[in-house]
Curated annotation (Swiss-Prot):
Disulfide bonds: none annotated. This is ESX-3 secretion-associated protein EspG3. It comes from the Bacteria. It comes from Mycolicibacterium smegmatis (strain ATCC 700084 / mc(2)155). It is found in: Cytoplasm. Belongs to the EspG family. Pfam families: ESX-1_EspG (PF14011). Keywords: Chaperone, Cytoplasm. One of its GO terms (cellular component) is cytoplasm. Disruption phenotype: Deletion of the gene impairs iron-bound mycobactin utilization and EsxG and EsxH export.
Length: 293
């Protein structure tokens, strides 16, 4: 079996997509044209092709390695995908994408000016979890009582805290359980890394994406999963639970299943350890308090 990955500069990646006629890269990777004037294109392609030939990605006849060509095409023309944004500090952003096309799955990760394309065999929801958490801090699932908040209330709370409202008072007002407050405090004070996940697909010639996404947050106190559900009145509710691998797999399954094509793995239903659930699961407390003027 040959290599299943290639690391390129963003300029090289753009060059290959151009040469292959694969189209543009997804916005989440932010790989944009490296020249502002189209007259610079020929010189740019010549320089990049020479470097790619030295790397063995392009042969002496100018043909792109078929494996690399397939990976690039899968990312640029994905029929289903997960957009990933990993944040670990101010200005420290890792961009990623899980791209599916036919039977091919490719993971693209961009860090600064380097982007890696990796062909992967992902045939089950659980196989996605290591990919979705690759840019995090490797924390174990946190231990706290599940709780839920209207997404709009969480956004208002974030704004209040940024404007100087005491964090402890805001969390108490929201009804965050005492067992979860140290974790939530570490989220708001910046002691965390997290990934935001949004699902999408091409459907009838159009791009369709989920209205909301899933977040996985690593804090000094452990890993938190935040996943959305829609209330009967149409309001989005964010549920906070310990970030176990099973919980993450189920959350992403629900996210992809909300798109028109449904689940990515319809023949691989998720199973749960009901003994473990009975010992650890608590019904989330939904707080729907009215903001005082």
């Amino acid at each position: 079996m040959g290599p299943n990955a290639v690391e390129l500069t963003t300029d090289q990646a753009w060059c290959l997509a151009d040469v292959l006629g694969a189209g543009s890269y997804p916005w989440v990777l932010a790989i944009t044209p490296p020249y502002s004037d189209h007259s610079q294109r020929s010189a740019f392609l010549a320089a990049q092709s020479a470097e790619l030939t030295r790397m063995g990605v392009v042969n002496s006849a100018g043909a792109v390695d078929p494996r690399v060509a397939q990976w690039i095409t899968t990312v640029c023309r994905a029929t289903q995908w997960l957009d990933l944004r990993f944040v670990s500090g101010p200005g420290d952003l890792l961009r990623g994408m899980v791209a599916r096309r036919s039977e091919e799955t490719v993971v693209a990760l961009r860090n600064a000016q380097l982007v890696t394309f990796t062909a992967m065999d992902i045939g089950h929801q659980h196989a996605l979890v290591p990919v979705l958490t690759a840019g995090l801090s490797g924390r174990k699932p946190a231990r706290f009582d599940d709780f839920a908040l209207p997404a709009a209330a969480g956004a208002r709370a974030d704004e209040q805290i940024r404007n100087g409202a005491p964090l402890a008072e805001v969390l108490e007002f929201l009804g965050v359980p005492p067992s979860a407050r140290p974790l939530v405090e570490s989220v708001f004070d910046g002691r965390r890394t997290y990934v935001e996940i949004v699902a999408g697909e091409h459907r009838d010639g159009h791009r369709v994406t989920t209205e909301v996404g899933v977040s996985i947050i690593d804090t000094p106190h452990g890993r938190i999963l935040v996943h959305p559900t829609k209330a009967f009145d149409g309001e989005w509710i964010s549920t906070f639970t310990p970030g176990s691998a099973d919980a993450i797999a189920m959350a992403v399954e629900r996210l992809t299943a909300s798109l028109p094509s449904g689940s990515w793995f319809p023949d691989q239903p998720l199973t749960r350890d009901f003994d473990e659930d009975a010992a650890t699961h608590r019904e989330p407390v939904l707080q729907r308090r009215t903001q005082k003027a």
